[in-house]
């Protein structure tokens, strides 16, 4: 049994889908399928049920998954130690980041890091705030970057930048005329397009509404989307408002595709997460230092 076979098995088991697993680990579906079949044949076990185009773990597969994950974690710990011995000359740093940060704020930081340490392979996975925190807790990522607060006692949290949410509307929306708005107007006078629950953007907006004495469930939510771009496109096309990161909305505002409504929302923090009990690699420390010298407002200008 090889490390690659273990990694392939875990990827397929977690997704229960050959093609998605192959994409995640950058192999062809045929290579993934062959690896699983070879593993089953060599040990005389069946790890997956093939049900039409779907696959499901057998009871044997479910039991083996726990051991496979533990073994991979031990191997990665050994790899981390070796990369430490080599300093910052080579190695890998796995990052998870919430969408706003990953799409608009983090790429320039990653580019500067690559230029400084070209031998370190940076891997970035995008999720919402909750999935980013879960990845750091599980050891799938050494660092996570999220918007706003996160309630996870296993993690340390450091503010690396700040951002503001803006209420944006289409140019033909009534709020585009610059009229002063109250929190009550936000509830009564417009439909809304929102990010999904669990996203830092939505959590920050709902927390701000509570601070204004508004129950978030009273907002007239017309549509929910899993990405900032989808939210912005929907607002541009219809009679809805949205609360979105100023960084992500900046180009739309500059081009006149959207207008910022006259309602100020509190600033929020971009936070860097790491596990309190896991060793901090030199690469992660170097990246954290680079994060601390960037501000999203500079990126948006």
Which sequence ranges carry the predicted segments?
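Short helix-boundary/capping micro-motifs
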Residues: 10-31
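Conserved amphipathic alpha-helical core elements
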Residues: 39-40, 113
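Hydrophobic hinge/microswitch elements
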Residues: 128-133, 137-141, 146-147, 206, ...
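Flexible hinge/capping segments at coil-to-helix
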Residues: 157-193, 197
């Amino acid at each position: 049994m090889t490390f690659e076979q273990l990694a392939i098995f875990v990827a397929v088991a977690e997704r229960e889908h050959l093609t998605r697993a192959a994409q995640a680990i950058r192999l062809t579906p045929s290579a993934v399928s062959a690896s699983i079949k070879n593993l089953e044949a060599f040990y005389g076990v069946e790890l997956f049920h093939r049900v039409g185009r779907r696959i499901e773990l057998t009871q044997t597969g479910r039991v083996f998954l726990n051991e496979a994950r533990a073994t991979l974690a031990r191997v990665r710990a050994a790899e981390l130690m070796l990369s430490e011995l080599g300093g910052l000359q080579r190695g890998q740093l796995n990052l998870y980041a919430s969408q706003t940060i990953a799409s608009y704020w983090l790429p320039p930081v990653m580019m500067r890091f690559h230029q400084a340490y070209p031998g370190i392979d940076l891997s970035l996975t995008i999720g919402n705030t909750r999935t980013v925190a879960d990845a750091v807790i599980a050891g799938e990522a050494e660092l996570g970057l999220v918007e706003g607060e996160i309630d996870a006692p296993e993690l340390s949290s450091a503010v690396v930048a700040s951002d503001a949410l803006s209420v944006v509307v289409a140019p033909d929306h009534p709020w585009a005329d610059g009229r002063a708005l109250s929190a009550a107007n936000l509830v009564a006078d417009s439909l809304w397009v929102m990010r999904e629950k669990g996203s830092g953007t939505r959590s920050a907006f709902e927390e701000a509404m509570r601070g204004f004495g508004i129950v978030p469930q009273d907002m007239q939510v017309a549509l929910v989307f899993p990405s900032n771009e989808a939210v912005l496109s929907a607002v541009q096309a219809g009679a809805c408002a949205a609360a979105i990161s100023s960084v992500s909305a900046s180009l739309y505002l500059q081009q006149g595709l959207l207008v910022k409504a006259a309602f100020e929302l509190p600033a929020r923090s971009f936070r860097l997460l790491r596990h309190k009990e896991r060793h901090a690699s030199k690469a992660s420390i170097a990246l954290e230092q680079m994060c601390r010298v960037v501000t999203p407002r500079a990126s948006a200008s």
